[in-house]
Amino acid sequence: MKATRKITYTAVLLALLIVLQWATKSLGQFVTGSCVNCVLAVAALVVGWQGGLTVAVVSPFVAFLLSIGPKNIAVVPAIAVGNAVLVLVLWLLLNRRFSVLRAVLGVVCAAGAKFLILYLLVVQVLCRVLTLPEKQAAMFGTMFSWPQLVTALIGT
């Protein structure tokens, strides 16, 4: 794929991801998260790891700036890292020969890796390091645990 086309596809996927986050914000984490992960998977498989990483890392920051993402800036880099891990694992496992086994393995590994990264970074590190109100820490503990695995599995 030519560089101009890759850049265009990356920009369109980033815009699509932002619009989907805005449009599904009121529908809850399972719908929004699944949509986000779906766009990330498409980005990884269509434009490759570079474009996928761009969408994965830039989108949480743009969502925060537009007030459609998390309200706490401290979790935004963790989300970017989780998204990046999902993209990289999918790309590494699926960019070569395609098979059903490889696809299932790629989805499960990518979803599991994203869940693990977000759980460790947000729940185990940020919630302990930051002085968060108890209610917000509990909310992060719920949001960034098993629902991340479910939305990653659904979306990818």
Located regions from the model:
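Loop-helix junctions at membrane interfaces
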Residues: M1-T156
